[in-house]
Every structure is written in C-alpha cells, then in structure tokens.
C-alpha cells in the first residue's frame, strides 16, 4: 500500500503528460503538490520523518535543496543557450553548417557529418532541443525528406545526451549521490562505447533508404569510422577528464579525424558524387537528395579557415577553459579550493564551486566568444533576451521536478519504491535500469530531468539489492540519453522546424525500435557490471 502511495506522484506526472498532454511545467507542479501531500499524510514528513525540525523545517529544507540544485543547473543552461543564440545571430552556426555540407556531394556522407557529428557537437555545447532543431532543416536543404531528416537527427543526437550542455545531466546525480563527477561520467560512457555503433548503423540505414540507395560496402566503412572516431574519444574524455566535454570534445575530435580521412580519400581516390553513387540516388525523385553540399540560401557563406575559427570561437574557448581547470594543477587546485557551502538543521546541505563550475566557464566563453566574433551589443542583448524567454518554462519544470524528487527522498517515498522494486524484480533490475532512464526522458523531454526524477530510486534500489551503485547510475544516465529520440517534446521541437507539426507519431514509430534495443543492450551490460 505504501509503495503504491509513493508511486502516485510519478504516475500522476505520467498521466498528465502522456494522457492529457500537459507541459512538463504544469505536470511537474501537480506532481510536486501530490508528493508533498503524500509525504505529509502518508509518510509522516515532519512528524514521524524528520520530527526534530517539524513540518515547516522539513518543507523549508526540501525547498532549499530543490532551489539550490535548480540554480546550479540553470547556471549552465542559461549561458549554453545564450551561446547558441549568439551563434545564430552572428552567423557562426551557418558557417559551421555550410563548411560541413561542402565536404561531400554524397548525401549519406552528409548524414554522418550533420546528423551525427554536428548534432553531437551542438548537443555537447547547448543541448535542450537545439541540435535537432538546427540540423533537421539543413538535412532537408541537402535533399532529405522532412520525416527522414528529423528521424536521423533524433537518433544521432541521442547518443550524446548523457553529457549534453557541458555535462548538465551529471549535475543532479552529483548533488543527489555525492559521487565524484569523474566517476559518474566514466560509469555512463562505458555503455555508449559498447553499443553506440548500433543506433549509428540504424541511422545510416534509414538515411540510405531516404536516398533510394543501400548500405554499400563503402558506406559501411564510413559509418564504422564515424562511430569509432566519436565513441572512443568520448569514452576517453569521460573516463580521464570529466563530464563536461565528452560529447562536445568527442564530436570535435571525431569530426576532425573523419574529415581528415575524407579529404585524403577524396584527394587520392575521390569521394563518390551523386552521379557515381548507387542507382537511384541521383534521381531519387521528389524530395530526394540534391548533390549540392549546402542549402542554396547559404551558398555564399565564407568557410575559410579564419571564418571557421571565428565561428567556433565560443566552443574552442570553452574547451580550453575546461581543460585548464581540470587538467592543469597550478590552475585547477586554487580554483577548486573556492567552495560555497550551506546547511540547514535536519541534514539539508548543498555546495557550489563557483570558479570551476561549467556555468561559469560557459559565461566566460560567451563573453570572450562575442569579442572574437565582434558581436554588436544588440546581438548580445537579443541572444540573452531570447534565452531568458526560453528559460521560463524550463525553470518552472526543473524546480517542480526537483521539488517532487527531493520530497520523495526526504520523506522515505523513494526508499519505499526501492524496496518494492527490489522485492518484485530482484536480479532483473539491472536490465530494467536503463529503461527507467528512458521513461524519465520520455515523460520530461530532458535527460537532466530524468536523472532528477530517478537517480535516488536507482541508488536506493542498488542498496536494497546489494548491487554496486555506480554501474546502475551509469545505466540511468545512459537510459536518459537513449530516451531522447522518443521524447515528445524533442520530436515536436525538431519537427516544427521542417513543417512536420502534427506528424510526431510518424517520427516516434521510426525511433522507438532502436530506442528499446539500445536500452536493453545497455541493461544486459549493466547486469554484467553490477
């Protein structure tokens, strides 16, 4: 009975978002309100649980923890999105997109460059729906039908969400568990390293069918190369550097290696153009691929080395700052020593490292990048204004979900759910752990929010079953990433940019299969690791 009561807030959020199609902000508020009611009436928060501080002290502590964690996450989201909007305003994004498009006339190669490397790069730098919204129109511009464009961009982007927006999904996990960020990033990356090639192969199969061709031997080779050049650097960065740069840095390193090989092959042997490709590509019919490497409207964009450096300045500065503050002890040690901490009676605590926090590094990257790009003040103001407007529903949803999660933890509701899960699933829980992450992302539209909702459940269940906690937390973060291609919010945002509004179900039907396969593979690995 108590387990059912404990599950009610999560079930309510599911019902409101999936059944009534409420936004995450409204559903989160309703779920948080119900969680508070159940915590007080059903679990005795303030009387049987935390009696020393009483109900008022318990509610104040929960609100403080939720508000503090929300602020640390928003400190990342705000400058990350501001950089993205500044890039759009200054034309930096167009330069990067067109430079990729001019590398090959084969739309399947362009799918690797845009739906894989470009979306992963943007996911690492900004995340929160921007990669697919940006990549889908460009894929349509090089000839893919809108439905195919959104599907392959969603699948490609999903591999990098575990470390999206400079590692934002890891932040609530650190706050909830106390594990070192490096431990959590390493535990998450191993799943993508093992199976990340699977969604990429599916992505390329769909892209090839979209061009009226097949997965030929050469495309298999390019696909495997694209997978290896991203997944290996991503894993290495996550394991030895930290959670901020695996997706962004992995995409940058992988793209550089892939493009270098592409240019060498084109120079020595020639990359196939449309006329040299498999039958049906050059005349794929209405909506089929064009041979131009970039949309006509962007044909005159400057893609010289100087223009590319200027366009990528915010991200290059960010990478430099992250490496300096993580790998150079004379810089990192004194900065890490500045920590702000707070605590309230009842064991409510929080800490913040302002000088090395990813949000601070993003703010510096935004300001220095704007200087390099010589962005006018109106463009800076416009980027910030757009970002602040975009943050309103995100802030409400994030705070509501955190209130729900922290209420459940502090009242013992999460512990009760964990005991029920341990009793009913036993040895099968590791297989299900990634699917829990998928469910969270499906409901909330955010890998970060999924981790907010279910990190404590994963920890408590691991303790109940006697499993090693880190592999299950890695599986949670992995699942939160895997669920991105079926998140309705993300599908709506991506589809809207290419005129697919109202056809979201068609996208989901094409992404749900690989989502479930990828998650189950991760679950089988989790079973071995725990």
Predicted regions and their residues:
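Interfacial loop-to-helix junctions that mark the boundaries of transmembrane helices
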Residues: 1-3, 21-27, 59-71, 182-190, ...
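Structural signature of hydrophobic alpha-helical transmembrane segments
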Residues: 1-8, 70-74, 126-131, 183-197, ...
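Structural signal for alpha-helical transmembrane segments and their membrane-water exit/capping regions
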Residues: 2-3, 13-57, 78-91, 261-269, ...
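Membrane-interfacial loop-to-helix junctions in multi-pass transporters
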Residues: 3, 70-73, 100-114, 142-148, ...
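Hydrophobic alpha-helical transmembrane segments of multi-pass integral membrane proteins
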Residues: 106-137, 141, 161, 395-403, ...
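Alpha-helical transmembrane segments of multi-pass membrane proteins
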Residues: 108-120, 145-159, 182-200, 204, ...
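Membrane-core helix-loop-helix motifs of multi-pass transport proteins
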Residues: 142, 154-264, 492-525
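Transmembrane helical segments that form the transport core of multi-pass membrane transport proteins
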Residues: 288, 293-440
């Amino acid at each position: 009975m108590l387990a059912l009561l404990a599950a009610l807030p999560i079930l309510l959020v599911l019902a409101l978002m999936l059944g009534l199609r409420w936004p995450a902000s409204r559903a989160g508020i309703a779920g948080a309100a119900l969680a508070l009611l159940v915590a007080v009436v059903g679990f005795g928060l303030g009387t049987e649980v935390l009696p020393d501080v009483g109900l008022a002290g318990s509610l104040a502590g929960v609100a403080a923890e939720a508000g503090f964690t929300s602020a640390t996450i928003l400190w990342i989201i705000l400058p990350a999105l501001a950089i993205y909007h500044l890039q759009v305003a200054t034309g930096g994004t167009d330069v990067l997109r067109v430079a990729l498009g001019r590398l090959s006339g084969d739309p399947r190669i362009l799918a690797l460059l845009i739906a894989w490397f470009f979306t992963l790069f943007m996911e690492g730098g900004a995340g929160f729906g921007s990669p697919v919204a940006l990549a889908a129109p460009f894929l349509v511009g090089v000839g893919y039908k809108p439905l195919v464009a959104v599907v392959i961009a969603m699948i490609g982007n999903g591999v990098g969400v575990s470390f999206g927006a400079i590692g934002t999904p890891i932040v609530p996990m650190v706050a909830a568990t106390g594990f070192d960020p490096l431990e959590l990033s390493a535990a998450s990356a191993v799943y993508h390293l093992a199976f990340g090639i699977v969604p990429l192969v599916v992505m390329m199969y769909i892209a090839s069918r979209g061009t009226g061709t097949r997965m030929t031997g050469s495309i298999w080779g390019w696909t495997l190369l694209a997978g290896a050049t991203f997944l290996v650097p991503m894993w290495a960065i996550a394991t030895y550097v930290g959670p901020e740069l695996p997706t962004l840095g992995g995409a940058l390193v992988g793209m550089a290696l892939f493009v270098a090989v592409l240019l060498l092959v084109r120079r020595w042997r020639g990359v196939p153009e449309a006329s040299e490709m498999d039958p049906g590509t050059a005349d794929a019919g209405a909506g089929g691929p064009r041979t131009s490497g970039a949309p006509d409207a962007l044909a005159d964009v400057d893609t010289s080395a100087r223009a590319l450096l200027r366009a990528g300045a915010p991200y290059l500065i960010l990478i430099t700052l992250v490496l300096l503050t993580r790998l150079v002890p004379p810089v990192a040690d004194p900065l890490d020593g500045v920590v702000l901490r707070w605590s309230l009676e009842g064991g409510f605590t929080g800490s913040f490292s302002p000088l090395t926090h990813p949000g601070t590094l993003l703010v510096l990257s935004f300001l220095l990048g704007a200087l390099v790009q010589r962005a006018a003040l109106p463009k800076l103001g416009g980027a910030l204004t757009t970002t602040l407007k975009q943050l309103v529903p995100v802030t409400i949803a994030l705070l509501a979900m955190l209130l729900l999660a922290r209420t459940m933890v502090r009242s013992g509701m999460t512990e009760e759910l964990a005991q029920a899960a341990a009793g009913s699933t036993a040895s099968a829980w590791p297989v299900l752990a990634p699917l829990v992450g998928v469910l969270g992302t499906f409901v909330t539209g955010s890998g970060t929010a999924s981790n907010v909702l279910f990190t404590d459940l994963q920890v408590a269940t691991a303790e109940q079953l006697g499993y090693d906690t880190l592999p299950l937390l890695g599986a949670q973060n992995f699942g939160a990433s895997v669920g991105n291609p079926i998140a309705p919010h993300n599908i709506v945002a991506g589809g809207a940019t290419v005129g697919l509004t109202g056809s979201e179900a068609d996208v989901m039907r094409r992404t749900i299969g690989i989502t479930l396969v990828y998650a189950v593979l991760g679950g089988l690995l989790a079973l071995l690791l725990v």
